[in-house]
């Protein structure tokens, strides 16, 4: 099993399935996770009103102890992340350090705000496509381009999470986790 650690950002309005499914699948694979709250609140109210207590507050200085950064979607959550300079700088820092940055649903709009999508091939929720003006958008459930891993929506969250496991650990670990969940995707 892996000894990798992943930081998953959450903010008010984050799509809860895209955060919680990722955390759950990564933990099943033995990959450590840390839910980092963006903003001041001790509890995050997600896009469907589910309240989640982050493990701590997003701190870009602490962020570099992680092997990957995940940006879930959700209109309100991604808006908060696009407006947070420390999130944008953290994304750039992860990439500069050669680390994986993953985003799902509207999450790639945060990557665009950080100025890192130019020349990249990626996907997002189709409703976010009009906002994404750089790079090459493709209509695929999960897309890998170098240090970027992107996915489309809550319905692709399991495939996205398993792709993270494969990238951070191995295809064999991803297969074992998928089998244990009876995932047939």
Each model region followed by its residue ranges:
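Short, hydrophobic beta-strand segments that form beta-sheet elements in well-ordered domains
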Residues: 35-37, 101-105, 120-125
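Extended, subdomain-level signal for the structured scaffold at the beginning of enzyme domains
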Residues: 1-97, 110-113, 118-119, 131-139, ...
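Cytochrome P450 catalytic-domain "roof"
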Residues: 144
